[in-house]
Amino acid sequence: LSACTLGPLNLLYCGNYYFQYFPLRSFFPISLLFLISIHYATKSRKAKHIIAAVAWASIALALFCNFESGIICIIVFAGYVILQKAYLYTFGDPKIWKTIFAQIFCAIVSILIFICTVQLITYLRSGQALGINELFFGILAFEGTGFYMLPISFGLWIVYIIVLVYALYSALPKLKSERVGEKQIADTRISTALFVLAIYGFCAFSYFVGRSYSTNIYTLLFITLSLIHI
């Protein structure tokens, strides 16, 4: 779970109590990783469906609290579910495409819930609805102007990316393993953990890189160390 905290070290090295980073942007990634762990360990198909429903509901809340964190959660959970099917079926099998479209549908529903919730609250408080530009004003302004963006340096960032790429490379070869009907003999626990953490790592990198402080690399060390340990 520590792999997704993405922020507490800010409090240690600079005393920056910016709670929009932690715990607000960390709670839902941590919770989702916990749900993924339970989902993977559960054998009951019904229980898996319930856990998946809870996960998508939490993703809708994540989008509401912090849109970027919610997008990270969407990518990670959808990728995890698709990966589990890819261990069982080839990409030519209709079952895996059914899973892919189901994850896209769930992602769209979560985003619509977020938009409707924001619009409802805004309308009740102001009597007006937000336009699309107003709804995503903060994100568009930040990305468009490079607000507080600093050029990244090489060194630790390159090591970080190398670890993520190697972890992803180590997880994917099992997709080429022999599939026998619904079963695959190889244990996919390690490769699933590598895949999920690597995707988290890439998403977190795209989010934190260059933002305000070059020392943001230290907020991502949990992921790197966890991958190296695995």
Language-model-detected regions and their locations in the chain:
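Hydrophobic membrane-spanning alpha-helices of multi-pass integral membrane proteins
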Residues: 191-204, 220-226
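Conserved small/polar residues in nucleotide/adenosyl-binding loops
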Residues: 228-230
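Short hydrophobic alpha-helices at membrane interfaces in multi-pass membrane enzymes
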Residues: 30, 39-61, 95-102, 184-198
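Alpha-helical transmembrane segments of multi-pass membrane proteins
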Residues: 25-37, 55, 73, 111, ...
